[in-house]
Amino acid sequence: VLDVGTGTAQIPVELCRQNKECRVIAIDMAAHMLDLARFNIEVDGFTQRIYLQQIDAKDMDFEQDMFDCVISNSIIHHIPAPRSVLQESIRVVRPGGLLFFRDLMRPESDEEVSRLVEMYAGAENPHQQQMFDDSLRAALSLEEIREMVTSLGFRDDMVQATSDRHWTWTDRMQDN
């Protein structure tokens, strides 16, 4: 499994907890996030199954068709040119392999942004509220991610709104 934008590596840790055979390469550009990830992996005892690398997701130094599965949670809205991350992920997943991307979904109005910030970050400090507001505004809309997925040769109906603030794209690479 390749985890793109692993952050603190909570998802790879959970994958390894649930599947004794799972091995994960977890990448992130932020050194401070990888430091937190390294700590979490050590605490949970998965240093032999989760491998961290500081890599730019837009230009991954992995062989084509290398991974059975590529996952990514909440990184797309942080990347100015997200299409390149999707292209690279498609390149490195093997035929028949799984693609799983989830991210924030940009609301259709300022009022909806405010409502979501209040609902999900209302108890947080103003800085955290602003970060969530900024993230929602930076996110792709459902229509934008569907258009992007279609332009990459995949079906747009494989991208779904999975909450009031998230979209999820799950698909399999076609066998050659």
Q: What function would you assign to each model-found segment?
A:
Residues 97-103:
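Conserved beta-strand signature within the Rossmann-like core of class I S-adenosyl-L-methionine
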Residues 58-69:
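A short acidic, Gly/Pro-enriched loop at the edge of an enzyme's catalytic core
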Residues 84-95:
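A short glycine-rich, Lys/Arg-flanked "PGG" loop and its adjoining helix->strand segment in the class I
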Residues 168-176:
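C-terminal lobe and adjacent flexible extensions of AdoMet/dcAdoMet transferase-like proteins
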Residues 69-81:
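A short SAM/SAH-binding and catalytic strip from SAM-dependent methyltransferases
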Residues 32, 79-84:
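Short N-terminal helix/helix-N-cap motif within the alpha/beta-hydrolase-1
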Residues 2-4, 9-59:
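Class I SAM-dependent methyltransferase SAM/SAH-binding core
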Residues 104-168:
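C-terminal alpha-helical "lid/dimerization" subdomain adjacent to the S-adenosyl-L-methionine
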